[in-house]
Amino acid sequence: MTENIHKHRILILDFGSQYTQLVARRVRELGVYCELWAWDVTEAQIRDFNPSGIILSGGPESTTEENSPRAPQYVFEAGVPVFGVCYGMQTMAMQLGGHVEASNEREFGYAQVEVVNDSALVRGIEDALTADGKPLLDVWMSHGDKVTAIPSDFVTVASTESCPFAIMANEEKRFYGVQFHPEVTHTRQGMRMLERFVRDICQCEALWTPAKIIDDAVARIREQVGDDKVILGLSGGVDSSVTAMLLHRAIGKNLTCVFVDNGLLRLNEAEQVLDMFGDHFGLNIVHVPAEDRFLSALAGENDPEAKRKIIGRVFVEVFDEEALKLEDVKWLAQGTIYPDVIESAASATGKAHVIKSHHNVGGLPKEMKMGLVEPLKELFKDEVRKIGLELGLPYDMLYRHPFPGPGLGVRVLGEVKKEYCDLLRRADAIFIEELRKADLYDKVSQAFTVFLPVRSVGVMGDGRKYDWVVSLRAVETIDFMTAHWAHLPYDFLGRVSNRIINEVNGISRVVYDISGKPPATIEWE
């Protein structure tokens, strides 16, 4: 019997902050399970979830607006600790009898708050001391409104010159509010405050660890599928790879992985996937060479969104054909992770805007009646990687830079041709190899090469050549929602350019993309 790793759990109500998923990841890092729900949940849903504590996230709205989001009143009647962050503090103050109004000055960025009263939330936590010995905390503010009167049964714990109620608390009810973001690294003691709330005030044990998550997932898979056969589309990406390893541990030879080589992969990637999972780990793998089929379907298509849809459609067709060849397969496994679940829920409630369509196994043939196995659906990406390491997957594979589902199909601009893909593969491999050699690969968040469908004149020896252009792209980011272009050394860029032009016959010019996100996206298509 495996331990119940969901026994102690935190509920996070999302009011729309860009940092809300980060709050959840921080709670998980503390070894405690949590879930992220939209703010408008019902009392019955909260009761059913039975949280050990509740966190109210930040958000972009103003509590002074009539129809702005509010926490369900039951949150304050459930008898569990509540922690309001930024907007979460404001709605807590307002709903419990305090007052909020728009501030004359919007506070955004670094601030230092002075602790003026003792509280379980910050006791013994400090970054510095005032001249008269009061603790100071370095925090990250991001708010326009501010609490101007706290509820009558609360006390002021900390303040700044422009924000009189930076932390408020009702110790008896274990309600706490902070007007800053403890989840971001700029709030230097933020993790200690979250740990104090989750582990000490809510009394949650650290049961959510990679080894225990694996044991739990294996037990759940076995309980769900029994002796049935399962099929998985293996791409070699982090999510499908960790899904494959978990299923292999749980059901062994009852798992069949279908690896579709679409001709849009990185250099030698197909061989590496087959060697690792087939030869090294001993998984059942069906290898489907399908380059011609994908490239035929893409012929003549220039529109990025149409290309994504074609690649997704052909993948499903090929995968379905292979699935139908297998006997007695009852289950389809997918590498869905928790942010996918959150995004789907947001889309269903009309709270998300699709910028690019996501690429996944989009459907099953109607004649196939299969159940769905999603062993990673409770996990964030960083947790998936930690589990992969625990399962024996190599670090370099798990911490590789992100690669889009449609692969080179969206890194070749315009029409996708085999010639373009082959040139791009080799140029990209040189860029990545040089990044690793210069110890720069792990210093950038994502790096890749883009094929531009334009010819440029060049000189090679005594002759002129009229060949293709590629662009190098490297960015630095924490969350991929915003990104800065990486300031790579000029001599490094020169070395990469020389190698590509000299070693890849067909490329005459290399450029470097210096666009940030926004306004540009990280990928070109």
Swiss-Prot record:
PANTHER family on file: GMP SYNTHASE [GLUTAMINE-HYDROLYZING], GMP SYNTHASE-RELATED
GO function terms (MF aspect): ATP binding; GMP synthase activity
Ligand binding (ATP): 235-241
Descriptive protein name: GMP synthase [glutamine-hydrolyzing]
Superkingdom, taxonomy of origin: Bacteria
Known partners and oligomeric status: Homodimer.
Class of the enzyme per the UniProt entry, highest EC level: ligase
Task performed by this protein: Catalyzes the synthesis of GMP from XMP.
GO cellular component: cytosol
Entry EC no(s): 6.3.5.2
Pathway as given in its UniProt record: Purine metabolism; GMP biosynthesis; GMP from XMP (L-Gln route): step 1/1
Residue stretches making up the GMPS ATP-PPase domain: 208-400
Keyword list, A-Z: ATP-binding, Glutamine amidotransferase, GMP biosynthesis, Ligase, Nucleotide-binding, Purine biosynthesis
Catalytic residues as annotated in Swiss-Prot or TrEMBL: 86 (nucleophile), 181, 183
Glutamine amidotransferase type-1 domain location: 9-207
Catalytic activity: XMP + L-glutamine + ATP + H2O = GMP + L-glutamate + AMP + diphosphate + 2 H(+)
Keyword ATP-binding: yes
Entries under CDD domains matching the protein: GATase1_GMP_Synthase (cd01742), GMP_synthase_C (cd01997)
